[in-house]
Amino acid sequence: MHIGNRVNLPMSTWIDVPHCNLISIEDNCGFGENCAILTHDALAKEFLRATRLGRVTIKASCHSGMGTIILPGVTIGPRSFVGAGSVITSDIPEGVVAAGNPARVICSLDEYLDRQRAKLETLPNFKYSLYDFKNLTDARRAYLVSELEE
């Protein structure tokens, strides 16, 4: 198994350990809780007397939301986002946002980021480095709550 630099891989991520040598995760990738990365499909092995194996390649700067399932034989292109709860059954191209079961391309990453930037101009927003779990003090928690009350 190859895991690049600056990869956020939570402990709850399920990795297909017997065939983990078929998994490659490049730099700057992130996963939400409870994701699964599968390199084999033994569902019909009783009937087929065989199992499907396939590489999983996750290119640089990809991010998968909570509960994403990545099936054997797929590549997720660089700079792509996958929505929470998605099932990746085929390749995801570079620079897109994909979601669903099976996952389909929703829009380009640039379109998504433009929409998010516009939202940040009108909604309360907070500098991530101050409010991530490592730096979230009681005072910052209280400030967040007060800012988000309506």
Stretches with model-predicted labels:
Residues 1-8, 12:
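Extended, small-residue-rich solenoid/repeat segments and analogous flexible loops
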Residues 2-4, 57-59, 77, 93:
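Residue-level recognition of short, solvent-exposed, well-ordered loop/turn junctions
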Residues 10-75, 102, 108-110:
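Flexible, glycine/small-residue-enriched loop-and-beta-strand segment within the central core
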Residues 51-64, 69, 103-150:
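C-terminal segments of enzyme domains that contribute to small-molecule binding surfaces
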Residues 63, 81, 97-98:
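Short-chain dehydrogenase/reductase
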Residues 67-82, 86-90:
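Beta-rich strand-turn-strand
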Residues 93-94, 99-102:
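Acidic, glycine-centered active-site loop in nucleotide-sugar glycosyltransferases
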